[in-house]
Swiss-Prot record:
It is an enzyme of class 1 (oxidoreductase). This is Hydrogenase-4 component F. The keyword Nucleotide-binding does not apply. Possible component of hydrogenase 4. GO terms for biological process: anaerobic electron transport chain; anaerobic respiration; DNA damage response; formate oxidation; glucose catabolic process. It comes from Escherichia coli (strain K12). NCBIfam families: PRK06458.1-1 (NF005041), PRK06458.1-4 (NF005044). Belongs to the complex I subunit 5 family. It holds the Pfam family Proton_antipo_M. Its EC number is 1.-.-.-. The chain crosses the membrane at residues 4-24, 34-54, 75-95, 122-142, 168-188, 217-237, 256-276, 286-306, 322-342, 384-404, 417-437, 457-477. It is found in: Cell inner membrane. It is a multi-pass membrane protein.
Length: 526
């Protein structure tokens, strides 16, 4: 099968199911059942197709389709795998969550059709970001993710959710406009120096000629790009949309926003980071990333300590973790880059679990207020264990996966003489740990309210959490070889732009859990 057919199936599947879900609005009597079946089929096909494309790209190194317009390499493969897995799990969770909302009159069957329609449309726009090799299409796809997900944020039609949706649209549209300025600067400069100016629209072609780009223009372009796509990533001080959107959206949408959408913007930023490092060196980009990253971690850490809304707390944790990824990229080097990519994966798993858990809390307690949400171990013990495990993982406790990427970060920072940054980072991560542990202790063990019915929710709202917790434990103790292969391929691409590739073999694979280093070493020898 040709790559063009493969990409067409991948991109058109969520778009087709989006249209079918919207069409179910006309089947008023059987809309709920029909749209649920369509949704289930759509997310299953998406998972299969995404993993198929990732496997194909890993075997081939990189693949192109539609000329040079569509492209998946090792870096894109990592983000596509995350999108496919998280899209599937949040899709499964959505079935149980939305069934409860419809049964209790929070949503009508017609609105449920709208929800699933926009859910698949949102997946399509994020797929377009990940697979696009065209700089302008990449930017347009980022903008499209805002529009498609804004409807999901405001799906309940309440004043607070509509305000959050409009705030999200306005801030991200203004922010991403800066990204367009940076994109135009890169394109215009590339078109003036490349033998074929029309090829300057393609990222892979610009990368080949990036050493010819004007350093002054690229320095300015990176400032615009960091502000623009950093807004969508949730970096401070452009993060103001994120807490409101995450807290007001339905919980499965909150999980998608945090675990996939932020990654999409980060992927675009990393792709430009590679080009800019080739053009002007890594010192200036790394310095900016360290500044924005540390500010994001610092501000988020203090907000995590004082939050009393469980979903807003998790939203600020997303700001903190995106800041930490920026710090890891800013530290640089083979270990720092690998830690950043590993942390992106780890954060996606942990945050999806916790937003699903917070959704179960909201369904059971009817509130997100941490002064009311207490005694989960007595109210719904199975969910409580899963939620507690997710909270410990997000806090960076062993043997969970985030401990490994944070340990790599500390080691990379010390190895590259960033002692002050590492000391400050450790202090801030201690504050985050305190905030998350305090939240978990209160939610799990405080005296439960008498009016709340006891008993866990259905398997549709707990099975995704089980899968995620198992994956996090596996990633913290013995990372599967296919995952190592994807991470190694992604880190190789980023390192090729920072000129640190020759040192790769002797650094990051030594920090992996026992039994997983061998495959990474084989990959680095290719």
């Amino acid at each position: 099968m040709s790559y063009s057919v493969m990409f067409a199936l991948l991109l058109l599947t969520p778009l087709l199911f989006s249209l079918l879900c919207f069409a179910c609005r006309k089947r008023r009597l059987s809309a709920t059942r029909t749209v649920t079946v369509l949704h289930s089929l759509g997310i299953t096909l998406l998972l299969i197709l995404a993993l198929w494309v990732v496997q194909t790209a890993a075997d081939a190194g990189e693949i192109f389709a539609a000329g040079l317009w569509l492209h998946i390499d090792g870096l894109g493969g990592l983000f596509l795998a995350i999108l496919g897995v998280i899209g599937f799990l949040t899709g499964i969770y959505s079935i149980g969550y939305m069934r409860h909302e419809v049964a209790h009159g929070e949503l009508s069957p017609v609105t449920l059709c709208d929800y699933y329609g926009f859910f698949h449309l949102f997946l399509f726009t994020m797929l377009l970001v990940v697979t696009s090799n065209n700089l302008i299409v990449m930017w347009a796809a980022i903008e499209a993710t805002t529009l498609s997900s804004a409807f999901l944020v405001g799906i309940y039609g309440q004043r607070s959710s509509l305000e959050a949706a409009w705030k999200y649209i306005i801030i991200c549209t203004v922010g991403v406009a800066f990204g367009l300025f940076g994109t135009v600067l890169v394109y215009a400069n590339a078109a003036s120096v490349m033998p074929q100016a029309e090829m300057a629209i393609f990222w892979s072609e610009v990368l080949k000629q990036s050493s010819l780009l004007d350093p002054t223009l690229m320095l300015l372009a990176f400032v615009f790009l960091l502000i623009g796509f950093g807004t969508k990533t949730g970096l401070f001080p452009m993060h103001a949309w994120l807490p409101d959107a995450h807290s007001e959206a339905p919980s499965p949408v909150s999980a998608l926003l945090s675990a996939v959408l932020l990654n999409c913007a980060l992927l675009v930023l990393i792709r430009y980071y590679i080009i800019i490092c080739q053009a002007i060196g890594s010192d200036f980009p790394n310095r900016l990333l360290l500044i924005f990253g540390m500010l994001s971690v610092a501000v988020a850490a203090f907000f995590i300590l004082v939050q009393r809304d469980i979903k807003r707390l998790l939203a600020y944790s997303s700001v903190e973790n995106m800041g930490l990824v920026a710090v890891e990229l800013g530290i640089g080097g083979p270990l720092g880059i690998f830690a950043a990519l590993l942390h992106i994966l780890n954060h996606s798993l942990a945050k999806t679990l916790l937003f699903c858990g917070s959704g179960n809390v909201l369904l059971k307690y009817g509130t997100r207020d941490l002064n009311v949400v207490c005694g989960m171990l007595k109210i719904m013990p199975f969910t409580a264990v899963l939620f507690g495990g997710g909270a410990l993982a997000l806090a960076g406790m062993p043997p969970f996966n985030i401990f490994l990427s944070e340990f790599m970060t500390i080691t990379a920072g010390l190895a590259r003489n960033h002692l002050l940054i590492i000391v400050l980072l450790l202090l801030l991560l201690t504050l985050v740990l305190a905030g998350l542990v305090r939240m978990a202790a209160r939610v799990l063990m405080a005296k439960p309210p008498q009016a709340v019915n006891r008993g866990d929710l259905g398997w549709l709202t707990t099975s995704p959490m089980v899968i995620l917790l198992v994956m996090m434990l596996a990633m913290g103790t013995h990372i599967p070889q296919p995952v190592i292969r994807i991470l190694a391929g992604a880190s190789t691409i980023v390192l090729s732009g920072t000129h640190d590739l020759p040192a790769q073999r002797s650094t990051w694979h030594d920090f992996l859990p026992s039994g997983t280093a061998s495959v990474s070493e084989k990959h680095s020898e290719r």
